[in-house]
Amino acid sequence: MPNSIVIHKHGGPEVMKWEEIPLQNPGRSEVLINQTKVGLNFIDIYQRSGVYPLDLPSSIGMEGVGVVESIGEGVENVKVGDRIGYVMGTPGSYTESRLYPADRLIKLPEFLSDSQAAGVLLKGLTVSYLINRTFAVEKGQTVLLHAAAGGVGLLACQWLNRLGVEVIGTVSTDEKAERAIAHGCNHTVNY
């Protein structure tokens, strides 16, 4: 049986317990993933602390990378041995192995390491949503980006810069200003 970080009550980091969990064979349209890396995000803290309550006991974690170990009936988009990533869906990425719906997986390109993928999937979806759906940003526009030196902010700086957008980023220290500028932010406001 694989081990997983499980919470039985909401609270601080001390509520996380490393436990063996039962794991069945993949059902229809599911795959069994051997996790290699896990993304750490604020949503995990919110779930653990109860800001976003979970039915307990529960594992936490919304972003992971791994290798397909086995597939259930009807799975055609991935095969055993594929390197994959996933984000969102049912919490539970803080684990050695897990079942996951095959249609929510993405195959990872060779140039992207497992560590890079696990650290960028949720942030990348967030940036894409903000600059494509919330407001379709176009070349020549100016964007004010709060927390420009955070995980989402640094990715947004790069993406917006690539689109030809003038990026003004808010930061809280001179070091963060330097980091934001190094990632494509044109100007910073240090508050």
Describe each model-derived feature in a short phrase.
Residues 149, 157:
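N-terminal Rossmann NAD(P)H-binding glycine-rich loop of SDR-like oxidoreductase domains
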Residues 161-191:
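Adenosine-nucleotide cofactor-binding segment
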Residues 11-17, 42-44:
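Short N-terminal binding/cap micro-motifs at the start of the first secondary-structure element
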Residues 152:
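Hydrophobic/small residue at the entry helix of a nucleotide-binding pocket
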